[in-house]
Amino acid sequence: MADDATISITATLLPDEISKSISGSMTVTPDDTNDKWYYKLTACTATSTDLIAGSFLDYTAVDDDTAPTAITTSDKVKFLFIKNTSTADGVYVCFDGGTAANDLVDAVFIGPSQSWFGRLPNTTVGNIHAISSDIGDAGDATANLIVAALIDDVA
């Protein structure tokens, strides 16, 4: 469908002598009209902050006087895609509402020019925080991220 997200991936793993290519794909489909898309080029700084903020995309017809629907911290993120477009700095993302930091044991690190995606059915917008950083030490620059998400508008 036109409102779906489809991800295909091929990974080559293990040492050369026993390497294996594994491929897979997934499709994420909105369940109902409360599932809405979010897209933003986000400047992630060296201070932990919310990864998602602002408004949903208007991908259905609205008149010229209708403002975009605002995202709230209680909305549920059903699917999240992050592309780090920076060439030098990475980003740490935490999903439990804590402060994102380079020494957080349960954070995901997305390096320069790398992507990450996942389904997060019980994670709210207010739980997802990010900070720019180098792997293993604090960052000193802004990382630019393409953030796309399918979010359940619970408000």
Predicted regions and their residues:
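N-terminal low-complexity, intrinsically disordered "leader/linker" segments enriched in small/polar
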Residues: 1-63
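Intrinsic-disorder/low-complexity, polar/charged segments enriched in Ser/Thr/Lys/Arg/Asp/Glu/Gln
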Residues: 39, 77-79, 115-117
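Beta-rich globular "head" domains
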Residues: 50-86
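Beta-sandwich interaction modules
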Residues: 69-71, 109-127
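Short, surface-exposed beta-strand/strand-loop-strand elements in extracellular ectodomains
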Residues: 74-77, 83-107
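Hydrophobic beta-strand residues in large extracellular and virion-surface proteins
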Residues: 82, 91-93, 128-130, 145-147
